[in-house]
Amino acid sequence: ERKSNGPFTSLFDFASRLDLRKVNRKAFESLIRAGAFDQIHSNRASLLASVNLAITKAEQGHAHQGQNTLFEEFETSEIPLIDSDIWEERKQLAEEKIALGFYFSNHPFKFYEKMIREFVPNRLSELKPRESPYLIAGIISVIRMRMTSRGKIAIITLDDGAGRIDVVVGNKILTEVYDLIKEDKLLVVEGRVSHDDFTGGNRISAIKVYDLLTIQSSKAAFLSIS
């Protein structure tokens, strides 16, 4: 469609030129969250709020196409978007992850990196198996809960923008820090790195798990670990 009739000029133009039987509301929302319309309009929140209106107007236009009515001169590009506050960058990144499964325009770890690197110099991409524990930090990107003979454990994937690693949190520790383990949240982990025969990469077995508040209030104590 774009090659045949030129670039899309607005969300409403996009909706009016597509077969809405093939492109549904969820597809519109995913494209917006991923930034596909950024060159047309930079406010993704307004675009997302206007999806229903765009689809409704497009359906009306399709229904009256060719009839001698006002819809024959259907000017989709002139319909205003619904006003909505622009997303803060953290919100935008979270929405990208909903659509794509990963952060695209930036990485949320950057909001903490300067402070975290003062006492957690270890980047996830640089970790190697060793006996002494590491202190690591990253954003929780994936959480998997497993039942074992020793109770429930969590396998969480931490991501610092440069690398990723799976962290195994045993039942005892998990019980203590369960409320801290949430997707898209920063976590600091003290643990031992070992080779994971199943994935071929490394994984870390958690000894202790900390949230940002604990780290900020006890920086000096963590310098000796890192």
Predicted segments — roles?
Residues 224-226:
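Short, surface-exposed ligand-recognition loops at beta-strand->loop->(often short) alpha-helix junctions
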Residues 173-189:
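Short nucleic-acid-contacting surface segments enriched for D/E, G, S/T with interspersed K/R
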Residues 1-129, 192-194, 199, 203-213, ...:
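Sliding clamp-binding short linear motifs
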